[in-house]
Amino acid sequence: MKFAKTLERTLEEDEIPQEWVEAAIQYKALKKCINKVVNELEFLGLQKNTLKILLNDKVVEVNEQETNPSNPIIAEYILSKTSTDAHNIKPMLKITLDYSSEDYTKDHIVELGKELKQKIEALLNDSDTEYEEDKIIELKEDDGGDLQIVTSREGSLSPPASRMASPPTSPTLKVVDSLNTNIDEALLSPDDHHKKHEIFIMLNSDSKFFEMLNDELNSLDTLTQQEESKIIEEVKKIAKYVNELKLKQSELYKWRELFKVYLDSEVYFKYNETALPSQQKSSEQIKSNLDLFVTNLNKSGIMTRFKKKQSLETFNQFMEMNYHLLKILQFQTINNEALRKILKKFDKQTSLGIQKTFPKLISNDHIFMSGSSLAQSICYIIQESIIKVIPQLDDYSCPICMNIAYKPIRLSCGHLFCVRCLVKMKQDDKTSCPLCRKENAILYADSSNLDLESMELMKKYFPREVKEKLRERDKERYNELRKNANSGEKCIVM
């Protein structure tokens, strides 16, 4: 299926809002613009295959002692900005006829000149043969839509500097009148002082193509900012309700269980990994994970235990926020694909090679093209504002017994353990940290290593676990006392 149809179908099936559709990459309109670029190039005699050969020839090996490339004919498509702060793209096709290399015989130069004669004959259309400024050819459409060639000197319309290093004494183009003078003589018999001729060609439709694409990226930037602001507001509302609900112990445990299922489903990220530069999940993966979360949530039966109206409303808002973010990511994905496809089609139709140069040139101009992904930034806010509001037991578990680390001892290396496990290790003459192996970390631990802040948090948010931990500790102590009591000699009645 053609991508244009796929794009239309996706926007319809995903129920994308109309204002989003209007801000999307207008793939069909850009395709029509590319066709006009092709027509203009062919109008100038620069067919796709011809340009492909010339553009491929622009990369040459240059020895350290050489100042001139060895290609006698070079074509280069240059994209630049109109100014440092501007976002507008100025495209220009540069054709260089370089006869300065001694590696090419006169016959070879004549052969190359004949091949290019018909292509550039219409470009060199100025009767003034005296000035020695570089030639700029610009295409314009007249009122009837027909193409016209407009020529100018470098002083009136300066081309951008070439990306290739120019020779120290590069001569300028000798301009000839293609209708009234002998172009063969000008092209095929370059004199000793003018061995490098440069022509800058400004098309009409490629400028419109980049202007249209830039406008659409601006629209996507605006939409992204608007939707990001909406989601952040949704997150704030949910965070406010969750903060209120966590004060009630019964609701606290329900929401902790709900968030545990959410984290285990890894909808957008792995817990505590949103700030890592890991590869972003595709929108298909996210949708699958979100569906998995809903399935696991139904299996757990958590929702049947939600009795308070506020809890149900907050949960519904939480789900709406997730699906809102998913829809934005799906929209971003299809637009990223549309941008990639349209740049690829531009190159396929014209051989001008913008797939790498254009994104690099505008990478800092658009939110859509730069910075961390929307999913990563929003998910970080979700984690910090909502998920971490209700602490997870895994964050306060002892790595040795895997139960809550009460009473918590923080060793000098920073790792947290329950005091009971550390006492056992010390009794077994194990004095290094079990995780990082820091020597004598357990040996030198004392009452000052008791993490009072974590202990208060555990009592507040994990009252059931703390109570169970104390019960297990007392039971263990009782068993130890019995064991010690039974280890002595038994009384024997004679």
Swiss-Prot record:
Keyword Metal-binding included in the entry's annotation: yes
InterPro entries assigned to the protein according to its UniProt record, in alphabetical order: SPX_dom, Znf_RING, Znf_RING/FYVE/PHD, Znf_RING_CS
Keywords: Cell adhesion, Metal-binding, Nucleus, Transcription, Transcription regulation, Zinc, Zinc-finger
ZnF segments: RING-type: 398-437
Domain SPX positions: 1-360
Gene deletion effect: Decreases cell adherence to silicone substrate.
Record flagged with keyword Transmembrane helix: no
GO terms for cellular component: nucleus
Pfam families with a match to the protein in the record: SPX, zf-C3HC4_4
Signal peptide: none
Induction note: Expression is induced in biofilm.
Matching Gene3D superfamilies: Zinc/RING finger domain, C3HC4 (zinc finger) (3.30.40.10)
Biological processes annotated in GO: cell adhesion; positive regulation of cell adhesion involved in single-species biofilm formation; positive regulation of cell-substrate adhesion; regulation of transcription by RNA polymerase II; single-species biofilm formation on inanimate substrate
Role: Transcription factor required for yeast cell adherence to silicone substrate.
Protein name: Transcriptional regulator of yeast form adherence 3
Organism listed in the record: Candida albicans (strain SC5314 / ATCC MYA-2876) (Yeast)
